Amino acid sequence: MFAGHRWQIEGVDERRKVLQVVPHKGGRVPMFERRQAEASHDMLVAEMREVYRSDDVPAYLDAAAKELLVEGRQTYRHLKLDDLSMAADGGDLNLFLWRGSEFSAVFAVVLAMAGLNAETHDLGVTIAGATEPKVDAALATLRRMPAEDWERLPDFIKNIHSGKFDEEVPIELLKRFWLRRNRSLINDVRESIGLIAATSQPAPRQSKI
């Protein structure tokens, strides 16, 4: 978002600190904010989901906060997010992962490896220009992908030079550091891919014994 419009990044001039952009084809404000001021932990996102699921209204909320809570819960139930993982947003698709921002960031890189353009939001990722069948096909490709192919994951990071002195570090070394630092999250992503339910395919509920 910039100047009230959505833009698609087409190029990055890191030396001049310049982004080359074109108007986003969707041309509308996204439903979910895709840029986060700070990282969110798994436990925080899990607690947010429990708040959406609950009917309790904390006594300390003022009238405006109560109205926002009601709207959030109505949206959660309208999108059937207790059972479903995907929801269309104009020409894009929101994928709800219900994990922290670090997990979502790794998931976005994994989707890039499958040919999808994804950006993180507070509750997962938004996939630009995607449909449910397209995402399902990409996830199926990832499920079949051999372990050695996952070692190429850093090749799909949009900007691996995120640290202050990363420009001074050889890029292949940065890639190895990224793999080592995110190994457990990568394994979590691989496990979660088989559990994602498309909007047209509700996730089965587990029966209580």
Model-predicted regions and their roles:
Residues 1-209:
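C-terminal effector modules of nucleic-acid-centric enzymes and ribosome-associated factors
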